[in-house]
Each structure stands twice: as C-alpha cells, then as structure tokens.
Amino acid sequence: MLPRVGCPALPLPPPPLLPLLLLLLGASGGGGGARAEVLFRCPPCTPERLAACGPPPVAPPAAVAAVAGGARMPCAELVREPGCGCCSVCARLEGEACGVYTPRCGQGLRCYPHPGSELPLQALVMGEGTCEKRRDAEYGASPEQVADNGDDHSEGGLVENHVDSTMNMLGGGGSAGRKPLKSGMKELAVFREKVTEQHRQMGKGGKHHLGLEEPKKLRPPPARTPCQQELDQVLERISTMRLPDERGPLEHLYSLHIPNCDKHGLYNLKQCKMSLNGQRGECWCVNPNTGKLIQGAPTIRGDPECHLFYNEQQEARGVHTQRMQ
C-alpha cells in the first residue's frame, strides 16, 4: 500500500505486476482452466528513478477551491503514476474521471467504464471511466480470505484475478495482504482465455448454447475475419513463447501487436501499442476491413483522430459485406 498523507515518507515499493490483459479489459469473461502461465513484471524502480521524482505533489486547485485563501493542500492520497511509473501522483477521488493513462483511483476505488458502453476498453483508454467503489465481493475480506481467493483456479477465480490485477493499474493500490502467486505464471493463461473468449464471442451467430440445439439446426461457424485471424496468430505466438526466465520482460510483449477488433470482427480505426515504462504507446489508423495503414494518417503517442482520414460513406466499414461472406 502506498503511504498516505500524515505518514512518514517511505520509498515507493517496486511497481506492481503490469497485467498483460490491459488491451482486453473490455472483453467478455472467459472460462476454462489455465495451462502454461507466465508472469510479467515492470522494470524495478531504481534509486536514480526515485530520486528524479521530486517532492510529493499537492492537490489540484479544484480540490482546494473551498479552502480559505486558496492554499494548496497535500493530496488526500498518493498513488503511483500510471503504467510502470515510479513517482507519486494525487489519486483520483470517487466520481472523478479516470482511465488507462490517468492517475489511479484512490484506495477502495476502481476505474469502471460507463454501464452499457459498447467499447469499454476504448472508453478507459480515452480516460472516460469513473472512479467508483469496488464491486468485487472480496473487498473488505480478511487478508487470508483475499489471498485464498487470489489463488483460486476456478473459472471465477481466473476472471476475478484478471480484474484485480488489471484494476491495480487502473484503480487503487492492491491488497497488501495478498500472497504472491505460487507458480508466478497466471497472467498469460488468463490473457489467452480472455482473447479466446473475445473472438469466440465475435464468431457466434446467436445466443443459444450449442448443447441446447438440435444437431440438424447447427450452422457452420462464419468465416474468420482478418482481424480475428490475426488474433489467432497472436495467441499461437504467445502459446509457444519461451522466455529466458519466469519474469518475462515486458519488452517481449511490447513487440507483439494485439489487434483491436470491434464486435463485428473488423479492425477498429485506431490501433495502439501497449504502454511501456509509463509511456503511452504509439497509435495509428487502419482500414477497418483490411487492417492496412491509412495513407496520410499520423502515428503518434496520442489520438490520431482517425475519423478525419477515413471515408465511412464510401466503405461503411464493410459490415454488410462481411456478413454476406
């Protein structure tokens, strides 16, 4: 847990595990047991990096507007910078906007997309989430219970572990009493389960379970779109990845491009690399049907405003064409 105001100044602990599932935050919950698992960690916070952080920040002006004289007050709570940052920033309070690249939410809070959002991941990337009280049932449990829940290998345990580890990046500090993962190899398995479930859901033609339908009524699965095929290839590469040690440097993942597909299996206009060392990944614009780079669109660490470089009236994202194939 990070030190609060009023406590003695302590060096920040090493950055938490940077979850591999950041790009798949909005994917449907997956099930199934995990096989091979690898843990990915942020680079350690060296004394040089900590020394470069400077003095603790103060609350923003809006938070102290009611204070007489407008004096800048210390933050109500200090949290680490987004991603793998080592310095302290003011935590976001309940009801404040949050996202992947914004300061984390305070203790007991998490960053959630708005209910009913069709693209929850995109909302979090754009900083359009909201800091709300944690919804998971294990919050407030004893450290022993939390640790036991964290080691659960059931379907719910896998999903909850993913949400917890991901929200440690987006929300408040993690559970101080949580035991370290015994195998040190859970994140990659959860990632594969999530990606598999994501494109499995995109490939479904209906809401009925196969086991409840007559065999004669079953239809062959629709053809995989280029974006879904690329997801398959990424899964295959990760499943055969052999790392020099169980820590798995983040650079191994950063070299992989995980395609951002929409609910129809087409490419989203904006594609981005993962963040690394607290630095926002590059983003670029692609054709939603082919995934190819749109000529003239920039590649920047921010929003390239892809809608300005793609004529939707001409191609209309090819949704009807894809459905007819």
Curated annotation (Swiss-Prot):
It comes from the Eukaryota. Residues 38-134 form the IGFBP N-terminal domain. Residues 198-226 are annotated as: Disordered. GO terms for molecular function: insulin-like growth factor I binding; insulin-like growth factor II binding; protein phosphatase inhibitor activity; receptor ligand inhibitor activity; signaling receptor binding; signaling receptor inhibitor activity. Keywords: Disulfide bond, Glycoprotein, Growth factor binding, Growth regulation, Secreted, Signal. A motif (Cell attachment site) lies at residues 301-303. CDD domains: TY. It holds the Pfam family Thyroglobulin_1. InterPro entries: Growth_fac_rcpt_cys_sf, IGFBP-2, IGFBP-like, IGFBP_1-6_chordata, Insulin_GF-bd_Cys-rich_CS, Thyroglobulin_1, Thyroglobulin_1_sf. Residues 224-306 form the Thyroglobulin type-1 domain. One of its GO terms (cellular component) is extracellular exosome. Disulfide bonds join C42-C84, C45-C86, C53-C87, C75-C90, C98-C111, C105-C131, C227-C261, C272-C283, C285-C306. Interacts with IGF1. Interacts with IGF2. Interacts (via RGD motif) with integrin alpha5/ITGA5; this interaction induces cell migration, adhesion or apoptosis according to the context. Interacts with PTPRB; this interaction leads to PTPRB dimerization and inactivation. Multifunctional protein that plays a critical role in regulating the availability of IGFs such as IGF1 and IGF2 to their receptors and thereby regulates IGF-mediated cellular processes including proliferation, differentiation, and apoptosis in a cell-type specific manner. Functions coordinately with receptor protein tyrosine phosphatase beta/PTPRB and the IGF1 receptor to regulate IGF1-mediated signaling by stimulating the phosphorylation of PTEN leading to its inactivation and AKT1 activation. This is Insulin-like growth factor-binding protein 2. It comes from Homo sapiens. The lineage of its organism: Eukaryota, Metazoa, Chordata, Craniata, Vertebrata. The gene is IGFBP2.
